[in-house]
Amino acid sequence: MADHFDVVVLGGGPGGYATALYGAAAGLRIALVEEQRVGGTCLHQGCIPAKALLQTAEVLRTVRGAKEFGVEAGEPTLDLRASQLRKQQVIDRLTKGLETLLKGREVTVIAGTGVVVDAGAHRVRTGDGTEVEGDALVLATGSSPRSLPGLDFDGSRILSSDHVLEYEEPPKRVAIIGAGAVGCEFASMLADIGTEVTLLEALPRILPGVDAEVSVALARAFRRRNISAHAGARVTSIEGTRELSVAFEGPEGATTVLVDNVIVSIGRSPRTAGIGLEESGVDLDRNGFVRVDGHMQTAVPGVYAVGDIVDTPQLAHVAFAEAIVAIKSILGEDAQPIQYDKVPWGIYCHPEVAFAGLTEEQARERGYDVVTAVQRFVGDGRALIIGEPEGIVKIVAERDGPILGVHIVGPWATELIAEGYLAVNWEASPEEISTLVHAHPTLSEVFGEATLALTGRPLH
């Protein structure tokens, strides 16, 4: 007979563990089924390890530029194995902390690969036959790297994001297929550690989801760093074994580059196959994502889905928010649906990119009478002091109305976006933000200056 809980959670990544922690904080008895250590892709193969290696790249870049500040440090060398060790120490510390937190809230963590055997009864079975059921079931099985037809990941020639995060020696030359957030982060990191990078994007510009002016600014910065970025590029062939010949066609014509590895970075697929969902009546779309309503509930009453298995932004903080909505819905509380077009995004390449809300193009497509302001970091005292004056803050607003979107490319953009997100989420007007005092000298002043510009009375 299956053990009974208030909520059974299948999957221990950000969506799953957030569901468990928030539910337990609300007094619910929770079972969490996870096949590996808790933490999921974000903690073990995504956000945390990637940003740890990007921080290594930043330190290397900073030391190389130390002479500009009058600091003689010589030419630095990189021990990537030591960097990987530090990365793993960060992961282990966070994982242990998460395990301790789950234990402290009395969440029952069950090790094993779970399968839904009866969605109506909210029952899950693991490989050793253990069964648990609940008054509600939350699906949070995550995602895996998506490959291209004929380009199966082999760990030597064709690499996924998982493989890239395990490099022990910097490759000499790579081609990266896909210039979205992850592709641009990899391009930036590898260029910093000495790799010759060719970045290929099939759509008309790199970072195709961001505002066009931000994309152009990042492409310009990449060119200055000798990252060979090609938008509108279609890969026509990949040949060879040890040395790979990558042929592609783009606006510049047909080109071939020789590389050591090809990194495929075109997104992630939901892990929904083979876990009993369709057999249980859980509705999936043609790409395998679970269909949910605004309260994260599936077609089966009492069964919810959160995180990467839902066709929403595949971001850990979005999974956290979805987990809260799911638990509030289970408790019968007022759970406001998430406004996905307003959530903040952070891309940790150099220079960093961050945004929240609508791009200028999206705002115009939705019929807004749009006004914009662009303020450059080159005029900001703090940006010049830290030696990173490249980039812009762009604000998209409705004429005589609220701020619709904030888009940043430049130093510490992933931290600066917090103020932009609050402005977008609270539908603040440029006039309201322009009355706020920004400390000087700070990078945040650039955002304040942009709001002043939208009032028609810029200060600088």
Whereabouts are the PLM-identified features?
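Glycine-rich flavin
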Residues: 2-5, 21-28, 33-170, 198, ...
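N-terminal Rossmann-fold NAD(P) dinucleotide-binding loop
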Residues: 16, 183-184
